[in-house]
């Protein structure tokens, strides 16, 4: 049976107090603040009477840091994604090619050495298809706002069998509004796109 004092402590105010405390930390994987949040929760559970153990284990983490995007020399706000490769500081540069939602096949060689501009939310399948079609980078046009997402299909830390599901070319996303401007520019001219990504991807210790 539940301890009567524990039942008394169950309340919306008590819950929101804990949520507010936890949300005050930026809990990036492998960060000191993530560890502090874990210790805070462990202490709460210990005080209730649970036996808990905080362990540190190796994990392959990926945190998007920054991206820049220039289309025809005009800077456009963009965001990169977890598991996107980082570029060199000066970025990559190539002609852009709009391929719609990229569900249909395109003529072989059409994307060779180009940066693909694709409709929809960033995902591994479209990135991998662009890569195998010869693209060196991908710009996704989001349906609305840019969603935080991971562009890998290797769930959890990759193994020798799943590492092939991690993208090999850099990826950024733009808003739908910016995407319409990019499409208009590409339809009128042959345009150079420059994109740079910085993503902190590495093995590190994280709590659990």
Locations of regions flagged by a protein language model:
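Noncatalytic luminal/extracellular "stalk/propeptide" segments of secretory-pathway proteins
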Residues: 2-13, 17-115
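Alpha-helical scaffold elements within enzyme catalytic domains, especially in hydrolases
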Residues: 21, 43-44, 129-132, 185
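Solvent-exposed loop/turn segments at secondary-structure junctions
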Residues: 29-30, 58-60, 103, 121-124, ...
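Alpha-helical metal-binding/catalytic segments enriched in His/Glu/Asp
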Residues: 45-46, 120-121, 208
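Hydrophobic/aromatic beta-strand patches that form the interior of the parallel beta-sheet core
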Residues: 53, 137-139, 172
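BRCT (BRCA1 C-terminal) domain core and associated BRCT-interaction motifs
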Residues: 62-64, 69, 139, 145-154, ...
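Soluble metallo-hydrolase cores and metallopeptidase-like ectodomains found primarily
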Residues: 76-108, 158-208
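A conserved hydrophobic secondary-structure block that centers on an alpha-helix together
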Residues: 102-145, 149
């Amino acid at each position: 049976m539940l301890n009567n004092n524990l039942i008394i402590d169950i309340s919306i105010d008590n819950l929101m107090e804990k949520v507010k405390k936890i949300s005050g930390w930026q809990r990036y994987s492998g960060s000191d603040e993530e560890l502090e949040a874990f210790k805070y929760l462990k202490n709460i559970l210990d005080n209730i009477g649970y036996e808990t153990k905080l362990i540190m284990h190796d994990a392959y983490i990926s945190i998007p840091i920054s991206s820049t995007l220039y289309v025809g020399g005009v800077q456009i706000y963009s965001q990169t994604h977890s598991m996107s490769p980082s570029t060199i500081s000066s970025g990559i540069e190539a002609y852009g090619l709009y391929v719609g939602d990229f569900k249909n096949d395109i003529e072989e060689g059409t994307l060779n050495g180009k940066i693909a501009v694709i409709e929809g939310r960033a995902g591994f399948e479209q990135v991998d298809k662009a890569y195998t079609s010869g693209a060196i980078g991908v710009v996704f046009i989001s349906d609305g706002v840019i969603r935080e997402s991971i562009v890998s299909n290797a769930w959890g830390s990759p193994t020798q069998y799943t590492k092939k599901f991690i993208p090999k070319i850099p990826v950024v996303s733009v808003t739908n509004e910016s995407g319409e401007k990019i499409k208009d520019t590409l339809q009128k001219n042959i345009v150079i796109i420059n994109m740079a990504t910085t993503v902190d991807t590495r093995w590190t210790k994280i709590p659990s």
